[in-house]
Amino acid sequence: MANNMSSRQACHAARYVVARVLRGLFWCLKYTVILPLATMALMALFVLWKDNTTPGKLLVKEINFVRQTAPAGQFPVSECWFSSSDSSGRSEIQGICHYRAADAADYVRETDRSLMQLVTALWATLALMYVSLAAITGKYPVRPGKMKCIRVVTADEHLKEVYTEDASLPGKIRKCPVYLPDDRTNRNNGDKNEHA
């Protein structure tokens, strides 16, 4: 009987730990991935709608830019050099950017790199914002809901009064209702309850 109770307690503890880990993972997924990506999608739709632009128009604009900037068979790739100039004792950093002609592979690599930097920076900013708002509003993954409190004691009426008025128990536990199982019910249903 004692082994059965300890295995039940271990099972309940394991389920609690698994539920808590899953709750934490879902919280992280929600506030660091789902909400930022959904916001980015809505922002992209809003920008396209506001400028009366479609992805096709953007492609045509980019193709025309490539044709005007680079010679045939070449693609423009932006290059920036940063130099520090000492003017009047101050060190200022000036960015000097220009376009150079490159092959298709270099153009693809540079475009992917710049888009990835932009998307990653926007995603990280939104994820930080959503996690901060969740922390400020108290939406933590470790908060279990309101738990019910029931104290189980033996079926002695005198003990019921003692347990109900026991001053050594914390206030929250003292306010919990006391449950006194009936010995006859336990003896009759003992086998049923153990296998259920």
From Swiss-Prot:
Organism superkingdom: Bacteria
Record Pfam families: TraP (PF07296)
InterPro entries: TraP
Keywords from the UniProt entry: Plasmid
Protein name stated in the entry: Protein TraP
